[in-house]
């Protein structure tokens, strides 16, 4: 595809006026998320971290709150990036850091929620084991490992994110070798509206690189190319000159290249093409001649460009017409998207759904039916909200790999993609309110202190209840045996 987003793995935000409905909706969501999530998560972090007794449950939710708080701190940059239609005034470091924070929040949150689900499942099915092995130190070690893995999953953002310049504005986007994906790609304008091929792909060398016609005299495979200035004959370029000029190609945005007819190509002569002073008649059909002899266009049929003598990166440029004709998605981007989908969503979702299904089934069988653990309800609802917020993000990411961005469906998909990003970011502001609102009597909770609310939400009630029930069953079995 031709675009991928600044914050995400999937699609770049299209260049739309700030007053378009998708942009307005995204800005509203991001603004509310920041205004509510920053104080909410900060309050939970302060109370649960400094005022409450440290338990296994508080460790889980403290780290979850920390991940949400980091995401909220990055939202002003994302909001400004959206309002500026993709302009990036923050420099390269923040170009790598801000998108990675959102990805870090995704992986850290989903891994922590998976750990909480497994912990709840162990509490129900292995109460005796939990009494002996479930402790704060183990929970802290697991959280440390989760942060390390989440950071590793962000490495592609640091590797592939770069700053590009277009229309005197800095852009933050992915770059996969010669393939580049910038934020707000439509901001650059339609390449077909440009009147020169150099606006899309710069040929090696400039007009001031022309050599003195008398400096080279050779009859080795002359290529006659007329220009509007004077008739000239090009000689086969040397590998050294092509290697020097090809270095310039790596900085070009070669991902979505639209070749213009040769009659509108500005007559620039690549350096390293010696010129022999020879009178030649201009060709009437210059576009056909250029495509046949210089292989500038994908329709050319001649294979006499001496590929064996060209450096590899110049051969990549030479084969430009073949590697993006069908909007082929770069392989690294496919790998990043699929990895995030599987590791950051599908696999954890299956584990969490299975864990809570087993817990509900076990609780309905008898002795667990009366257990009303606030922590269990909090965990279930937090997982459900996470899935609701992040599902559109991953759906848009996969569809962006499959749908042509130039099709009507593709354009609609791209225009609403940043709404899915904003919705995913909004997940970071919900949890503090879920901790406070989940309970039988909200009015009673409203009269409690913040510390009392969090202590009730993060209580170890299920552990104690399960342990007591397990001891009762054990005692009943002993009395029956006697």
Swiss-Prot record:
Intracellular or extracellular location(s): Cell membrane
Protein name: C3a anaphylatoxin chemotactic receptor
Extracellular side stretches: 1-23, 81-96, 161-340, 401-417
List of residues that carry Phosphothreonine: 463
Gene3D superfamilies given in the database record: Rhodopsin 7-helix transmembrane proteins
GO molecular function: complement component C3a receptor activity; complement component C5a receptor activity; G protein-coupled receptor activity
Glycosylation positions in this chain: 9, 194
Bilayer topology annotation: Multi-pass membrane protein
Role description: Receptor for the chemotactic and inflammatory peptide anaphylatoxin C3a. This receptor stimulates chemotaxis, granule enzyme release and superoxide anion production.
GO biological process terms on file: chemotaxis; inflammatory response; phospholipase C-activating G protein-coupled receptor signaling pathway; positive regulation of cytosolic calcium ion concentration
Positions where Phosphoserine occurs in the chain: 459
Segments on the Cytoplasmic side according to the record's topology features: 47-57, 119-139, 361-377, 439-482
Cysteine disulfide partners in this protein: 95-172
Secretion signal, residue range per the UniProt entry: none
Domain of life: Eukaryota
Subunit organization: Interacts with VGF-derived peptide TLQP-21.
TM annotation in the entry: 24-46, 58-80, 97-118, 140-160, 341-360, 378-400, 418-438
């Amino acid at each position: 595809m031709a675009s991928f987003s600044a914050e995400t793995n999937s699609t770049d935000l299209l260049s739309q006026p700030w007053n378009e409905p998708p942009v307005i909706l995204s800005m509203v969501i991001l603004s509310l998320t920041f205004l509510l999530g920053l104080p909410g998560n900060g309050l939970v972090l302060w109370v649960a971290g400094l005022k409450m007794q440290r338990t296994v449950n508080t460790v889980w939710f403290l780290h979850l709150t920390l991940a949400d708080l980091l995401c909220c701190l990055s939202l002003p940059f994302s909001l400004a990036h959206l309002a500026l239609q993709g302009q990036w005034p923050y420099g390269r470091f923040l170009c790598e850091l801000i998108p990675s924070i959102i990805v870090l929040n995704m992986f850290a949150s989903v891994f922590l929620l998976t750990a909480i689900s497994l912990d709840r499942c162990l509490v129900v099915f292995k109460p005796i084991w939990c009494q002996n092995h479930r402790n704060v130190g183990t929970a802290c070690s697991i959280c440390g490992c989760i942060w390390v893995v989440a950071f590793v999953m962000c490495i592609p953002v640091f590797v592939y994110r770069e700053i590009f310049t277009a229309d005197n504005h800095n852009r933050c986007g992915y770059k996969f070798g010669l393939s580049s994906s910038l934020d707000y790609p439509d901001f650059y304008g339609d390449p077909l509206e440009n009147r020169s091929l150099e606006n899309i792909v710069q040929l090696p060398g400039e007009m001031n690189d022309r050599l003195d016609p008398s400096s080279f005299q050779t009859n080795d495979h002359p290529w006659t190319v007329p220009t509007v200035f004077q008739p000239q004959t090009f000689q086969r370029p040397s590998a050294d000159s092509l290697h020097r000029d090809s270095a310039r190609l790596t900085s070009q945005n070669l991902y979505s290249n639209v070749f213009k007819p040769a009659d509108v190509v500005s007559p620039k002569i690549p350096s390293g093409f010696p010129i022999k002073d020879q009178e030649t008649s201009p060709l009437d059909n210059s576009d056909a001649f250029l495509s046949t002899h210089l292989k500038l266009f994908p329709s050319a049929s001649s294979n006499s460009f001496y590929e064996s003598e060209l450096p590899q990166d110049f051969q990549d440029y030479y084969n430009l017409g073949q590697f993006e004709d069908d909007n082929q998605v770069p392989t690294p981007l496919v790998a990043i998207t699929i990895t995030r989908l599987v590791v950051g969503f599908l696999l954890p979702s299956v584990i969490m759904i299975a864990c809570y299904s087993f817990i509900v089934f076990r609780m309905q069988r008898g002795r667990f039916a009366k257990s009303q653990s606030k922590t269990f309800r909090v965990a279930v609802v937090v997982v459900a909200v996470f899935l609701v917020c992040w599902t559109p993000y991953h759906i848009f990411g996969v569809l962006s790999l499959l749908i042509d961005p130039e099709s009507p469906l593709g354009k609609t998909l791209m225009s609403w993609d940043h709404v899915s990003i904003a919705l995913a970011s909004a997940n970071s502001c919900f949890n503090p309110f879920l901790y406070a609102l989940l309970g039988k009597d909200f009015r009673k909770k409203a009269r409690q202190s913040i510390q009392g609310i969090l202590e009730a939400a993060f209580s170890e009630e299920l552990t104690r209840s399960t342990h007591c029930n397990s001891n009762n069953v054990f005692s009943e079995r002993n009395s029956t045996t006697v």
